[in-house]
């Protein structure tokens, strides 16, 4: 099912504990560096399949930046904070700063990938960080089942063109390199 723009949310982390007695929460952040999650407010917090909005009153990195704690408006004691453990934290796409050029990785998810020969390779389902180069996981349903292709994200070598507006990526890659899942 496709979601409308208004339904799109960007998951930035999760509340994974409580900190102190005044309602502070521990955060597992997906941002890099981890404390960048504190740059965004308000947060959308998913509580029992419903998104609630919270202003971030304060926040800081702990343990040399390895963890993050935050104080959210309206959560003023340890017992109330405990109710939010396990809840996802998200923001709306318009809260992201505009990129001067380029794009955010999350904008590549769902893009249709075609080879220079015009062959449909499938859709980007994931971006895998490998250390050397990030890798696009592209999946396509075929008669033999789900075909998964890993394509190194190396501009001008394998990735020839990215158009996030039309959700299209052109690559110099062939399906013979694919593996079935």
Curated annotation (Swiss-Prot):
GO biological process: ribosomal small subunit biogenesis; rRNA processing
GO molecular function, one term: ribosome binding
Places the protein is found: Cytoplasm
Protein keywords: Chaperone, Cytoplasm, Ribosome biogenesis, rRNA processing
Main location: cytoplasm
Highest taxon of the lineage: Bacteria
Domain PRC barrel: 100-177
GO CC field: cytoplasm; ribosome
SUPFAM superfamilies cross-referenced by the UniProt entry: PRC-barrel domain (SSF50346), Translation proteins (SSF50447)
InterPro entries: PRC_barrel-like_sf, PRC_RimM, RimM, RimM_N, RimM_N_sf, Transl_B-barrel_sf
HAMAP family, per the entry: Ribosome_mat_RimM (MF_00014)
Entry's family note: Belongs to the RimM family.
Cited PANTHER family: RIBOSOME MATURATION FACTOR RIMM
Domain comment, as recorded: The PRC barrel domain binds ribosomal protein uS19.
Free-text function comment from the UniProt entry: An accessory protein needed during the final step in the assembly of 30S ribosomal subunit, possibly for assembly of the head region. Essential for efficient processing of 16S rRNA. May be needed both before and after RbfA during the maturation of 16S rRNA. It has affinity for free ribosomal 30S subunits but not for 70S ribosomes.
Subunit structure, interactors included: Binds ribosomal protein uS19.
Protein name: Ribosome maturation factor RimM
Gene name of the encoded protein: rimM
């Amino acid at each position: 099912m496709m979601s409308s723009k208004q339904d799109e949310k960007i998951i930035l982390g999760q509340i994974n504990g409580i900190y102190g007695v005044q309602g502070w929460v521990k955060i597992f952040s997906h941002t890099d560096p981890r404390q960048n999650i504190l740059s965004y407010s308000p947060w959308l917090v998913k509580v029992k399949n419903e998104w609630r909005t919270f202003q971030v009153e304060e926040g800081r990195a702990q343990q040399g930046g390895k963890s993050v704690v935050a104080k959210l408006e309206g959560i003023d004691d340890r017992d109330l904070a405990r109710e939010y453990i396990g809840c996802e934290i998200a923001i709306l796409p318009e809260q992201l700063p505009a990129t001067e050029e380029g794009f955010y990785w999350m904008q590549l998810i769902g893009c249709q990938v075609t080879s220079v020969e015009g062959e449909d390779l499938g859709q980007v389902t994931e971006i895998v960080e490998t250390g050397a180069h990030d890798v696009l996981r592209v999946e396509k349903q075929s008669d033999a089942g789900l075909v998964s292709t890993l394509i190194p994200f190396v501009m001008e070598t394998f990735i020839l063109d990215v158009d996030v507006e039309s959700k299209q990526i052109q690559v110099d890659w062939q399906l013979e390199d694919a593996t079935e899942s």
